Structure formats: structure tokens, C-alpha cells
């Protein structure tokens, strides 16, 4: 854990320091944070509050625990139990669950904080709908209507909610907050034979990428900025369990280190939106055992690490924004390349 923390804080701290030396475009902005229990956190361990405080933003955290996005995530066998489902109206909830309906979790209530004074809406959802997302992924690219408004699908529910946000705040910037791990087997229930059933959170990240492209909104690719995985390419350990002791929430780390790392990563990702060091420029072209980067800020440090955390080689982006780093001369296996803030996993065969 110490090596993970040290490496992550060095990488993120370097970029955050650069950002602090520049003008802060987020200072004074009014931000509404929409999400699940992960951004809701607990008092004293809430990363949206840390992000807002450090960037000088005025925050309204409207994340709600156990909040789904889509009615399609409410399993038929559990439909009698009240669910928090953001895309449902209060009337729809009352019709399904009567007096016990959690109407506070309807978009009609949550979005009351979104108005003409709102500058930014952070949309931090996905994990709770992971099973539905996993089912939808296979057909997304072959379905021309996948992003049509439909509250029974995940993508369609997001389309509905984005539309509702824009009705209330046409000039606000919607930003998708990516999930923090693209390699975690997340529990979704029990099979008929009594064994546990899982889906990989890589699907959540893939859905967020697809949605960002379809909706033309920025995506904070947090999973690239944190080494949080069931099997870390940097350390070989289960860093997910270290980051989330309860297997779901970073705020379950009572030391507060995970929440601080999460906030650092989000600040870093928000900084990328304003400096040009964004996802497309930090994803290299791989050819003949060499990673080729372009569009990086001059002087950006690009480094190659072994899975045990050893630094093998470094290079800096030239005045044209290009950087090249070779890994083909090393033994077959998995390596990690950091480019500024991004973490890219590569395999040398």
C-alpha cells in the first residue's frame, strides 16, 4: 500500500502542483454533484467536498446512497422493495411502492438544486447499474436507437436525465465522472446453484466512454489515474481491497487516504480539461515494442515501470509534444507507462 500511495501521490501531486501555478478556471463556480453512495460518502470522508474546497467551487452534493439510474435495474423479484431510482418521477415511485416510495431520490427532487446559476453538473453514476450495463454493452454499437430516451435502459435513462438537466440549466457543463477501476469483479447476486455472480467494472468504464462520445460531454477517466485493481500491474496486489476495505466504498478506508487519492485524481482529471492533457493525447500508439505519444505539453515526463514498481526508463515530451518510450527490449510481461497523470498498461509479448 505504501508503494502504491507513494507512486500515485508523486504522479498526481506533480500535475496538481502545475495546476496550482496556473489560473484556476473552477474558482467560484457553482457545481452540483449527482451520484451514488460512493460520492455521497460519510461526514469527513467525502471526495466531492475535498475537490470543491481545493478548487474553490461552491458545491451542492446531491449524491444518494443505493441510487440507480434506470428502471431496468430494478429486478422483477425485488420490485416490491422501494428503490432509489433517479430517472423515476415521484408519481411513478408512489404508484409502485405507495407510501414507502423514496421520492427524495427522484430526479424531480434531486434536480431542484440545478438551475440557471449552475455552472457544472458532475454525473457520478454507473456502479449501481453495473449488471444492466453489462447486458447492454454487447448491442450498443449496433443499435442506432441506444441513446434514445428510454428509462428501461441505462443509456436511454442517461439520455433522459441529461435532457432534464439541460432543461433546468441550458448553459451548464455536464461532466461524466468515470469509475475508479477498470479491473474489479463486482458482486451482483447469487446463481441458482448458490454460487456468487460477478461482473467486471471494466464494463462501467466502457459504457461511460460510449456515453461521453454520444452525448459529447467531457469524461474524467479516473480509472487511468489510480492504480485500483483486483490485480495491480504495478504491485501485483489487490489494490482494490486496499482502496475500498468494504469492497465498494473508498470512504470505508478509515485513514482517509483513499478519499484523498480519489480527490487528487479528480482534480487532476478536471485540470486535464483545461490544459489539453486529455485522454486522446495520453493514449499512445504502440508499434514494435515502443509507445509513441503526441500532443503532450512540452516537458511532460513519460516513464516505464515494471510490475514491482521499479522505474525502468523515462523520457520527456519534446517541443512538438512528442515522446517515445521503448519496452520491447524487456522480458515478456506486463508493464506500466505513466504519461503526466495517465497510467497505461502495456503487454510485451
Segments from the language model and where they lie:
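N-terminal secretory targeting modules
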Residues: 1-34, 38-61, 116-117, 167, ...
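Catalytic His-Asp segment of secreted/periplasmic serine-dependent ester chemistry enzymes
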Residues: 22, 77-78, 179-276
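Conserved SGNH/GDSL esterase-like catalytic core that processes O-acyl groups on lipids
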Residues: 27-33, 38-148
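Second-shell loop/turn segments in exported
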Residues: 37-41, 143-152, 194-195, 244-253
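Generic structural signal for well-ordered alpha-helices
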Residues: 107-111, 158-162, 205
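Serine-dependent acyl-ester chemistry module
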Residues: 128-152, 180-202
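A short helix->loop->beta-strand "cap" motif at the edges of active sites that frequently abuts
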Residues: 169-173
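C-terminal outer-membrane/trafficking sorting elements
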Residues: 280-349
Amino acid at each position: 500500500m505504501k508503494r502504491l500511495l507513494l507512486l500515485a501521490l508523486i504522479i498526481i501531486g506533480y500535475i496538481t502542483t502545475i495546476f496550482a501555478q496556473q489560473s484556476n478556471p473552477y474558482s467560484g463556480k457553482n457545481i452540483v454533484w449527482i451520484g451514488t453512495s460512493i460520492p455521497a460518502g460519510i461526514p469527513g470522508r467525502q471526495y466531492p467536498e475535498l475537490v470543491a474546497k481545493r478548487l474553490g467551487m461552491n458545491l451542492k452534493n446531491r449524491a444518494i446512497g443505493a441510487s440507480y439510474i434506470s428502471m431496468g435495474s430494478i429486478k422483477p423479484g425485488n420490485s416490491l422493495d422501494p428503490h432509489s431510482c433517479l430517472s423515476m418521477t415521484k408519481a411513478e415511485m408512489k404508484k409502485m411502492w405507495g407510501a414507502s416510495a423514496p421520492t427524495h431520490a427522484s430526479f424531480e427532487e434531486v434536480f431542484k438544486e440545478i438551475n440557471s446559476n449552475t455552472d457544472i453538473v458532475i454525473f457520478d453514476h454507473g456502479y449501481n447499474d453495473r449488471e444492466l450495463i453489462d447486458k447492454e454493452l454487447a448491442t450498443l454499437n449496433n443499435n442506432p436507437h441506444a441513446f434514445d430516451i428510454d428509462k428501461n435502459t441505462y443509456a436511454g435513462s442517461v439520455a433522459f436525465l441529461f435532457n432534464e438537466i439541460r432543461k433546468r440549466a441550458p448553459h451548464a457543463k455536464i461532466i461524466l465522472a468515470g469509475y475508479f477501476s477498470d479491473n474489479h469483479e463486482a458482486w451482483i447476486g447469487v446463481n441458482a446453484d448458490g454460487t456468487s455472480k460477478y461482473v467486471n467494472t471494466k464494463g462501467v468504464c466502457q459504457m461511460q466512454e460510449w456515453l461521453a462520445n454520444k452525448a459529447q460531454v467531457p469524461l474524467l477517466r479516473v480509472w487511468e489515474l489510480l492504480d485500483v485493481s483486483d490485480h495491480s500491474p504495478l504491485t501485483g496486489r489487490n489494490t482494490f481491497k486496499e482502496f475500498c476495505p468494504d469492497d465498494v466504498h473508498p470512504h470505508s478506508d478509515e485513514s482517509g487516504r483513499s478519499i484523498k487519492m480519489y480527490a487528487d485524481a479528480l482534480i487532476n482529471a478536471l485540470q486535464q480539461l483545461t490544459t489539453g492533457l486529455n485522454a486522446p493525447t495520453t493514449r499512445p500508439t504502440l508499434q514494435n515494442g515502443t509507445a509513441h505519444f503526441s500532443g503532450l505539453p512540452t516537458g511532460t515526463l513519460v516513464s516505464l515501470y515494471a510490475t514491482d514498481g521499479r522505474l525502468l526508463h523515462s523520457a520527456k515530451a519534446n517541443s512538438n509534444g512528442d515522446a517515445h518510450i521503448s519496452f520491447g527490449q524487456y522480458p515478456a510481461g506486463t508493464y506500466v507507462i505513466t504519461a503526466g497523470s495517465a497510467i497505461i498498461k502495456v503487454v510485451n509479448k
